[in-house]
């Protein structure tokens, strides 16, 4: 279904309710630049670096797009998805059945979920929705739940330390969304709905979270304007 959630005036903050879940795949593919390319890149990196039967957790897995991309390359892996939205997991389960993919999918708050013994953890465009006061503790949890040599891959929207550059990037991004068929009204509506819900960090702040948690290295593997994907090694 085509995303038309913000064509109507909104009266609440953004949440992943039924109205969003029903159009989520269209929404994210038109709202996040190079979304499909990022999923493909993550899948390729993990497929090259993980041992047979390695355990992968996608935290905030939404409709399981990333897990299904990995499954296409490495069906031997233990693929696990966690999302707090029951509607998201229902859609993910239906998709996994359609692909004949053996995915383990859980409805849970990722802050409370036990994913110990992981070989890889994925966190795509999810950390930005976690309250800043809880982010450092959560990244430390990811580090402690990964096995030695484990991989942490995450994607985030960014702010820049230079305020003018941040504003320029916001304008460039909103022009991108307009080119994807969103009206200026829809763009403004979503921006308002996400205010104080999606709180991005800078590239350096995201890297510092990983290094402070104990990861031995962290690199940016993809970046476009105010979006980036990172990889960290335990």
Swiss-Prot record:
Q: Which residues bind S-adenosyl-L-methionine?
A: 35, 60-62, 109-110, 124, 191
Q: Which processes are annotated in GO (biological process)?
A: tRNA wobble uridine modification
Q: Which GO terms describe its molecular function?
A: carboxyl- or carbamoyltransferase activity; S-adenosyl-L-methionine binding
Recorded hits in InterPro entries, A to Z, give: CmoA, Methyltranfer_dom, SAM-dependent_MTases_sf
In its keyword annotation, does this UniProt entry include Amino-acid biosynthesis?
no
- Write out the catalysed reaction: prephenate + S-adenosyl-L-methionine = carboxy-S-adenosyl-L-methionine + 3-phenylpyruvate + H2O
**E.C. number:** 2.1.3.-
- Superkingdom of origin organism: Bacteria
Extract the signal peptide range. none
Q: Provide this UniProt record's keywords sorted from A to Z.
A: S-adenosyl-L-methionine, Transferase
Q: Which Pfam families match?
A: Methyltransf_31
Assembly with partners or alone: Homodimer.
Q: Which NCBIfam families does the record cross-reference, listed alphabetically?
A: carboxy-S-adenosyl-L-methionine synthase CmoA
Report the function annotation for this chain.
Answer: Catalyzes the conversion of S-adenosyl-L-methionine (SAM) to carboxy-S-adenosyl-L-methionine (Cx-SAM).
What family is reported? Belongs to the class I-like SAM-binding methyltransferase superfamily. Cx-SAM synthase family.
Q: Extract the HAMAP family matched here.
A: Cx_SAM_synthase
PANTHER family membership: CARBOXY-S-ADENOSYL-L-METHIONINE SYNTHASE (PTHR43861:SF2), TRANS-ACONITATE 2-METHYLTRANSFERASE-RELATED (PTHR43861)
What is the protein name stated in its UniProt record?
A: Carboxy-S-adenosyl-L-methionine synthase
Q: Which organism is it from?
A: Campylobacter fetus subsp. fetus (strain 82-40)
